[in-house]
A protein has these predicted regions:
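Phosphate/oxyanion-binding loops and surfaces in catalytic or ligand/nucleic-acid-binding neighborhoods
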Residues: 59, 168, 190, 216, ...
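An acidic site on a long C-lobe helix of protein kinase domains
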Residues: 79, 157, 202, 221-224
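Short proline-rich PxxP-based motifs
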Residues: 187-200
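Conserved C-terminal C-lobe helix
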Residues: 201-214
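Juxtacatalytic C-terminal regulatory tail of Ser/Thr protein kinases
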Residues: 208, 219-267
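Membrane-anchoring helices that localize proteins to membranes
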Residues: 270-275
């Protein structure tokens, strides 16, 4: 089975939308990763561009959060690791997703997370694609610099990942406003609600990772996916030791960790200097 994304005729006649669609095909076709939905083919039929994806049976991460209310702490960490690994594969190819949200993460029947819909992905070495400063991302998860129309980088995806992790742990996004613009400005100006107040069993180490992911100052935010993954893996090990074991996707993620990492319990998580 496959999934086909077809551009509507009226959108296909819009040169900007058409370029965005073609860009998605080019960007995702470069990526091959177990946590990214694979592009099988792309082209145009009778003037209508299309992309053929692998079909992923399961549900979106958003649907999973809505169904369960919130996720287990260890499962939340595991999905964050898988998403970070997927984003890392994209960032290493100079591709920024720009719209990281749980609606764009599929959870397959085996419980694995797969990132999809690079519909507004942009290669870092392309120029002029956001010269008008438009905010293209979903504002519930939008990074402050993206909301302000500034340069968007891999760090912007990491901010969005932090918001997704917050939602997995609490069952809700951190900000609610009258409209999408109001929410975007809350990302620019307001501190996130206290994660541990919302969910007391979240450890200080995990809360510190979320804080650093969602730092508004780029200098305080994680610089790249490698540090994020390293810290999340260590937090998962600590959570495993504290709870006496994990289930579900956290078990699968633990099996992917280096043997040396699995032996180091408890593990120290690097805290940002400003905490």
């Amino acid at each position: 089975h496959v999934a086909i994304r077809l551009l509507h005729r009226e959108i296909a006649s819009d040169s900007d939308q058409l370029e965005r669609f073609r860009r998605e095909a080019r960007a995702v076709a470069q990526l091959s990763h177990p946590h990214i939905v694979t592009v099988i083919d792309a082209g145009e039929d009778d003037g209508r561009p299309y992309i053929v994806f692998e079909y992923v049976a399961g549900e979106t991460l958003k649907a999973r959060i809505r169904r369960l209310g919130r996720l287990d702490v260890s499962e939340s960490i595991a999905y964050a690791i898988e998403i970070a690994r997927a984003l890392g594969a994209a960032h290493e190819r100079h591709i920024v997703h720009r719209d990281v949200k749980p609606q764009n993460v599929l959870v397959d029947e085996e419980g694995r997370a797969k990132v999809t819909d690079f519909g507004i992905a942009r290669t870092l070495d392309q120029e002029g694609l956001t010269a008008d400063g438009r905010v293209l991302g979903t504002t519930d998860y939008v990074a402050p610099e993206q909301a302000l129309g500034h340069e968007v980088t891999g760090q912007s995806d990491l901010y969005s990942l932090g918001i997704v992790l917050f939602e997995m742990l609490t069952g809700d996004v951190p900000f609610r406003g009258e409209n999408q613009v109001a929410v975007a400005m809350m990302h620019v100006r307001d501190d996130l609600p206290d994660l541990q107040a919302r969910r007391p069993e979240v450890s200080a180490s995990l809360a510190a990772v979320v804080d650093r992911l969602t730092a508004k100052d780029l200098g305080a935010r994680y610089p790249d996916h490698l540090e994020v993954i390293a810290d999340l893996e260590e937090v998962l090990m600590v959570e495993t030791a504290r709870s006496g074991g994990v289930t579900g996707e956290a078990t699968a993620v633990l099996r992917t960790l280096p043997e040396g990492t699995r032996r180091r319990v408890p593990l120290r998580v690097r805290h940002p200097a400003w905490l």
